[in-house]
């Protein structure tokens, strides 16, 4: 174990089929994109339904360090008004703390291009292992200077903005194979460049393309003009004044719905999540289709004007054979938990980039599946999970690696495997501040 055996959380066993409605907080991906775009405007923007979690609080802290005001409504802390600096330039000679938040460490450096002095970036010790170089290479191509205070291409570092930004259209080439956030981080700020941006991804594959599409849609919604050629892996952005509408409502986090909706397949019964959008740019929007392939019954009833995603299972799970999860790798841990109980093996592929997430998620998933008696192995680009007899599975103290999705993965296994205890379940605060209460509440309904 690499974490102290303190604050163990006994994952509750599902004593009966579920019948629960679970309200999921706002999307982290959308929340942090909207916060960046609001900071790039010239007028205040009120964000309604903003996720309040460690990652979004870190983002607001980073923006406030740069001189952006983030005023939390006294009546509800999920309503936040963002006011850009009056000068139109963010502050330099400041320190930005990223924690372990990929969206903070990869989106906020772009804002430093427009600062009036150098900006220092640091984070949790575990964040020093997360790759950063592609987005920083991109900023260097735009004229910024990056000084590393540790390993090149990783936190901590200082960004000094250029004396002048490129007047003509900037040409930037990076290899974003390790994370779609490198592309998104540059696209979010590109409209503010005097000549716009032509961005090329030089890698063979583009990870999590839906997240990039989300960024493009959000930039467009703030007044940007983006031409995406996904087959050529290029994005061309025109210079535009950016301004989100005065009020923006954040969709629920559909990836965070995965443990709850997936619970219906593991424990049997029905779980409903309200406010499910008809259309969405979130990769989690693919989740209902994936669960259906695994044997769930999925429907989208509208009750009192609210659209729900309703998932019903009977405790049986269909394995998926070779299953390409390139489009939605962030829900791989939740799907892996379900597939531990499947009737045949599954090769989840297209998710090699998960090795660079909060932890090496592929290695972590293999370790923890084996820890409870399951069968799994890493593949070059993914993960293989094979069925084992039910009596082979057993309780264990499960590691979370300071990774919120590994904590929810362990909780899902605990629905069906007795005596699972989870180390540091509080790591779920990264995106679900009250995960333990929500999980217990689902089982009590």
Language-model segments: residues:
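Short, structured segments at the rim of ligand-binding sites
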Residues: 1-445
């Amino acid at each position: 174990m690499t974490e102290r055996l303190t604050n163990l959380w006994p994952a509750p066993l599902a004593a009966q089929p579920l019948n629960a409605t679970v309200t999921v907080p706002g999307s982290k991906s959308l929340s942090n994109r909207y916060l960046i775009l609001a900071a790039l405007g010239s007028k205040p923007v009120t964000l309604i339904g903003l996720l309040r979690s460690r990652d979004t609080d870190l983002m607001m802290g980073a923006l406030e360090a740069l001189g952006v005001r983030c005023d939390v409504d006294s009546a509800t802390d999920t309503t936040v008004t963002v006011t850009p600096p009056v000068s139109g330039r963010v502050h330099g000679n400041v320190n930005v703390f990223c924690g372990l938040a990929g969206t903070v460490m990869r989106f906020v450096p772009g804002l430093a291009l427009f600062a009036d002095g150098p900006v220092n970036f640091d984070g949790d010790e575990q964040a020093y292992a997360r790759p950063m170089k592609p987005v920083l290479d991109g900023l260097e191509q735009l004229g910024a200077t990056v000084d590393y205070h540790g390993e090149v291409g990783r936190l901590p570092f200082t960004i000094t903005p250029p004396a002048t930004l490129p007047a003509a259209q900037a040409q930037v080439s990076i290899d974003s194979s390790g994370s779609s956030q490198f592309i998104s981080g540059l696209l979010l700020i590109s409209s503010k460049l005097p000549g716009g941006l032509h961005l090329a991804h030089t890698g063979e594959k583009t990870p999590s393309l839906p997240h990039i599409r989300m960024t493009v849609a959000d930039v467009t919604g703030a007044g940007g003009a983006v031409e995406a050629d996904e087959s050529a892996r290029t994005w061309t952005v025109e210079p535009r004044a950016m301004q989100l509408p005065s009020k923006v409502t954040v969709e629920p986090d559909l990836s965070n719905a995965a443990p709850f909706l997936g619970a219906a397949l593991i424990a049997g019964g029905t779980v409903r999540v309200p406010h499910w959008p008809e259309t969405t740019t979130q990769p989690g929007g693919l989740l209902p289709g994936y669960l259906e392939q695994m044997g769930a019954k999925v429907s989208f009833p509208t009750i009192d004007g609210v659209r729900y995603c309703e998932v019903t299972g009977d405790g049986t799970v269909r394995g998926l054979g070779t299953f390409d999860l390139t489009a939605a790798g962030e829900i791989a841990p939740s799907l892996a938990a379900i597939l531990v109980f499947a009737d045949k093996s599954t090769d989840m592929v297209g998710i090699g980039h998960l090795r660079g997430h909060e932890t090496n998620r592929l290695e972590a998933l293999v370790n923890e599946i084996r820890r409870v008696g399951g069968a799994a192995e890493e593949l070059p680009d993914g993960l293989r999970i094979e069925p084992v007899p039910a009596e082979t599975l057993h309780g264990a103290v499960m590691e979370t690696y300071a990774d919120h999705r590994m904590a929810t993965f362990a909780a899902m296994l605990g629905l069906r495997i007795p005596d699972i205890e989870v180390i540091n379940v509080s790591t779920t605060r990264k995106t679900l501040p009250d995960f333990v209460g929500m999980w217990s509440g689902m089982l009590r309904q």
